[in-house]
Amino acid sequence: MENLFTTKEEKTKLSLTQIDNVNLNNITRAGFYVSSGWGNNISGLPQELDNNDSRAFYLVVFSLESGSYCQQILYSFKGLIFYRATSSSNSPFDQWRKINLI
């Protein structure tokens, strides 16, 4: 099949890294992640999602190359959005904060 993407479009496509069997506290590399299974083995979740039928989500991570000043935004497949950050590679993440859109 012919490739219908231009070079510019190809460079802007998002690539999602599948995650399972991970602790979100250890994901400090900038990127786009997805946990596509409701029952995936994920720790470090917001309390509202830390049960066996709520672990499907997108995770966007912003950070410097050193892993410091890291921010995580979690978009749950249930329509909930959460945010947390750390200001140092040696510091733990802040508590998850739920973002209310209304």
Spans of model-derived segments:
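Trp- and S/T/G-rich repeat-edge/linker motifs of beta-rich repeat architectures
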Residues: 91-101
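Short intrinsically disordered terminal tails
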Residues: 1, 101-102
